[in-house]
Each structure stands twice: as structure tokens, then as C-alpha cells.
Amino acid sequence: MLLSAYLVNSAVRPASKERPFRPKIRGACFLTRRFGEKIILPAVALLALVADQISKYLVLSNLNPGQSWNPVAFLTPWVSITHVTNTGAAFGLFPDQGSLFVIIAVIVVAAIIFYYRHLPAGQWWIKVSLGLQLGGALGNLLDRLRLGYVIDFIDFKIWPVFNMADSAIVIGVAILAYYLLRDRGEKENGEHLMQES
């Protein structure tokens, strides 16, 4: 009786489909994510450095110091490409202090790398900002070591002439300041809510 019931149930019940073998590699996503985070700074820094050096090479190859080029005629009153040699800091500040700024640039590069290595997981935008600052600092440092001065060329008429390395540094600092201030505000709000509760 029991045997016949078992045989009937076995005949009625469809055979279970075998699932394909899919080995689970624990930590694969974690490793990919960690690798992605580790290359943010060098990748962004390299992009900023290459863009800066290519733009300076084009200016150096096509314009004499003091010479200007106006790629867009109707923008001439507001912006142009002007070849300027800068022996000072960003935007032409503190001229003829090249050796001092080489030392400062080396310290800044070391500080960025140290700070980056001690950042917790995540913090993508902060890492991008550090990459921009590192690439910009290296771009201007390369100029000082190779030429003895920095090549500036972006001329907005009402502002000191600057270059793409300066732009990368300023954008990187702005991003970093925004996220640090935002995190500080969120922390203060959290502490305020805890005190109220």
C-alpha cells in the first residue's frame, strides 16, 4: 500500500530541474570595488597632468611669450589664449620664487598621497578632488623643473592668466571644501537631533 502510493506520487511529481553550477566567489565584488577606489587618485591625476602638459606643449609650440591667439572672434573682448611665463605661484602671485614653490609642491604632493592612503572606503568625490589637486600640482612642478617657470595661457582679461593645472587645483579644492563642510554639517545636525531626543 505504502509502496504503491510512493510510486504514484513519484510518477505525478515532475522531475526537479537541476540548477547550473555557479560558484560563488566571496569578496569578488569587494575586491573590484577596492581596486576601483585605489586607482581613482592615480587615474584622475594622470588625466589632469596629461591634459595640462598637452595644452602647454601646444601653446609653447605655436605662440611666443606675450603673443595671443583668439580662437573665437566674438569672445575676443573677454577671453583669449595668451602665452605667459610665470615664475611665481598660481595666477602669477609671488613672482621669482621658483625654488620655494618647487619645495612647496613636493610637500603638497606628499601630503595628498598620505591623506589619500588614510581615507576610509567610499569617499569617491574626495578622492577625485585629491586626484585633481595632485595632477595640477605635478603639472606645474614639471614645468618648474623642466623650464624654470610655469606656462600660463588662459586669459580672461579681468583675471590673472592661468593654466589647466591651476584649474584642476582650484576645482579639486572646491570639491574637497564642499564635501568636508557638508559632512561637518551632517555631523552637527546628527548631534543636535541626539541632544533633542
Task: Name every feature range the model reports, one short phrase each.
Residues 2-197:
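Alpha-helical transmembrane bundles and membrane-interface segments of multipass inner-membrane proteins
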